[in-house]
Amino acid sequence: MSDAEFVSRHLHPGDDLSSFSSDQPSLDEWLRQSAHHAESIRSGRTWVWTQDGSVVAYFTLAGHVFERHDLPQRIGRGSPDRIPAVLIARLALHRHLHGQGLGGALLADASRRIIVAAEIVAARFVVVDVIGDEAASFYTHYGYRPIPGTRRLVRKVSDLAHDFRSD
């Protein structure tokens, strides 16, 4: 199965989210109980993949700001005191899609949208707060670097853009 079989679009108010199950209850509950509210108050923008009208994957993006002193010196060097970023607040695939290599495609979809947004509104980093070691390993595989002492990983938007230009 390829990501070409899915429609990637913004979350619609009428989307039925009740059958989404990623095997991560906190991600499933947030989608069902909070995604529409986050949209309405503009605290997060959720994009979904649909297949035959059903939501089978999603990610949520939000604005974020780092304090330079919260970053390792090698990452924050040359930055202002407050550094604009994009937070990948949520990213999940329905459990029936696990193990098919689609997590990377979903992250690439989110990354493309971040690159476009960063052309309009400045963002130096992409940040993700991981739930566990498996998620940390996933993001590390795609070039994200951990911030010591946290469950947070970061990647420069310029590095993302470079990777997509190289493809």
Predicted regions, residues:
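Conserved active-site alpha-helix within GNAT-family acetyltransferase domains
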Residues: 115, 121-149
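Conserved acyl-donor/pantetheine-binding loop and adjacent beta-alpha core of acyl/acetyltransferases
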Residues: 58-90
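Short glycine/proline-centered loop/turn elements that form peptide/ligand docking sites
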Residues: 107, 132-135, 151-158
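A short, internal acetyl-CoA/4′-phosphopantetheine-binding micro-motif in the GNAT/acyltransferase core
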Residues: 89-99
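Conserved N-terminal entry element of GNAT/NAT acetyltransferase domains
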Residues: 1-23
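Conserved beta-hairpin
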Residues: 42-63, 70
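Conserved GNAT-fold acetyl-CoA-binding loop/helix
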Residues: 16-33, 44-45
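Conserved acetyl-CoA-binding loop-helix of GNAT-fold acetyltransferases
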Residues: 99-113
